[in-house]
Amino acid sequence: MSGLSIFQRLRWRAKILLQGKLKSLSAALPLIQGKQGLEIGGPSELFQEDESGLPIYERVESLDNCDVFRETVWATHKNSYAFSEHRAAGKNIFCDASALSLIPDQSYDFVLSCHNLEHLANPVKALKEWKRVTRTNGGLILVLPHYRRTFDHRRRPTSVKHMMEDYESNMGEDDLSHFPEILELHDLSMDLPAGSRKEFRERTLKNLSNRCMHHHVFDERNSRELLSRAGIEVLAVECADPCHIFLISRFLP
């Protein structure tokens, strides 16, 4: 979302008003209504009351947030996590999304994740960590960018086999194996904050300290398959403008 211009954001919000709430909202509400959750990489405009077809922030009982750094490209965090003016602030937890060592088992009823799984070198490891900190049959509301509608449109969706191999080899977040592909195929005309080709290259080489890189690329098919292979039941999949794949799901015991 950070690559959208002001015009694109206004156009997107106008479309939200026209398209209304997502059909999958009915599947999401039982997972989060009046429950305690953890967000990964929040806050997200997509979950706010006036900003999307999936307004869930004001329906939760409580919400904490996990981010890798106190200050990122997208947000600067305090110790408290103010996600809604109508709900008490939660707390910010600073650790890697695939290594939630600061969080005990079964601490939450659900996990929210919006546009950050693509930034992880080992998404299966992350999903399994999210399951660990979630209570039995806990919910997962996952939003991913549809590659065809983003600066990744020249790339191909990453195979689930590849992502499973990353998990089996315990791939670390310092991985740059996708660097040549990204440098060649990234559409900088759709990612103005990335700067020039040289600036983009330098930023990507420093990915461990900024986490801007999209390691993997998703569409409806491989995102659903990835969750299934990771032991997660997919309840609904829905695409929405300008570039979102919403996956409403539940962690299986």
Predicted regions and their residues:
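Helix-to-beta-strand junctions that scaffold the AdoMet/dcAdoMet cofactor pocket
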Residues: 120-121, 134-136
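S-adenosyl-L-methionine-dependent methyltransferase catalytic module, highlighting the catalytic core
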Residues: 83-94, 124-131, 139-253
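Hydrophobic beta-strand segment of the Class I
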Residues: 111-112
